Amino acid sequence: TEVIAVSMDNKEKALKTKSDWSIKNLNIAYGLSEDDARKWGLYISKSIKEAESDIFCEPGLFIIREDGTLYLANTSNMPWARPDLTDFPAKLIFAEENNYPVRGNY
């Protein structure tokens, strides 16, 4: 299992954020294009604060199976609607152990 965070930020800003937030055990990918963010169904926003990039994507959470199929997709148009990840690992273990099927595919 591999966890990767992906950002539309450039390398410098992504690495600064990783350092500022004390993120140690998470790979950060950067340079996601607006077009690719839209293909993933991510909402695009314009900055409202000086610290924000001019154009950026709102958060999304995706789980891709080893065979490349999408297992979970969660997107939001508001940053404060991010899912609480506290219990997320336990929920993933439950889903795997119980062979929980993909939902919302109709």
Residue ranges and their predicted role:
Residues 1-106:
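Chalcogenol-based redox active-site neighborhoods
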